[in-house]
């Protein structure tokens, strides 16, 4: 990649900004909603690459791309790690002779490369992203209310594979809205503050309606990141005001709405299930079955540490463990290990786990380096970016969230968009927006 990316035509900035906004607008509110925005970003990224190769005369390019920050070691490292995750996943699938369907999620890490590179060469319209994010959460909350109040579902699941990723992604997007509202409040942009705070409330409602217990694990992490980025005297009053409104609204939902009572019962049941497993060996409940699946995987991983087990091979091996009485039979009914890290370690070995952890850690660290930047926009975008890998690490403790198309698309698109937006804001802060 060139150190100083060439400018791209103005229409590509519009196209990529629209693709990013549509990704957040449709991610949880439309069937396969991730495909529309993600497809636009991929096509736009390829078009930017092509125009960069074909353009020989700088005056033909629009100046909208001139303010993009130069490529650094950080950019190249993120691209290399995305490529490494793809390569090791492909190697493991081919080595084990697994079905081609297990290449699906891995290929998306490869396709994220032109998206990331393209976004780094245009000017993202942050106001479009904010509107897409807020409107996406409004429709998500509406769908959650419709499913729980009129369709009769016990847990809102939107149009994704289950209630768990629905709640997790709603929480993440809601946190981003809250951070955006805090930034807008410090700039006295009250209309934007109201819009984004309402989006955060909508995301919180959708998370509660999903009754996702794994989401709670991420909350302390998000709170710490927000505190590091925003706890300055000038930000304290709007931040505390927004948090107070959010906490009050959450308490009202939990105390008065049926979906709140159901969520509370789910959280309390987790402790009962833990006691049933630890004291009575009951592996038939949600908590016990997950722990038994982890036990089976951790028994098996040392036998094939480098590239792990093929899916068909492991299913046969698991039945052998059950027959030998080492694992409870109920573990054999689960579709996966319900842990992102163990799942990768089991089926891609230590190589796959190292590549995946490296991507999470590098992304987290690169964003965290800007949490105390002088410019508030850079700090807020850094906080939102750092929240992505850390929240997904927390979500991955109890589910294979990146084993689903919606989960991996949300993660990769958000990583590319937030990284490009933060680097753009960083450049603007250095040059005065020139």
Where are these regions (language model features)?
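Transmembrane signal-anchor hairpin modules in multi-pass inner-membrane enzymes, especially those
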Residues: 1-91, 111, 121-127, 131, ...
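Transmembrane alpha-helices of multi-pass inner-membrane enzymes
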Residues: 42-48, 223, 359-362, 385-434
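Long extracytoplasmic/lumenal interhelical loops at the membrane interface
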Residues: 281-295, 303, 307-348
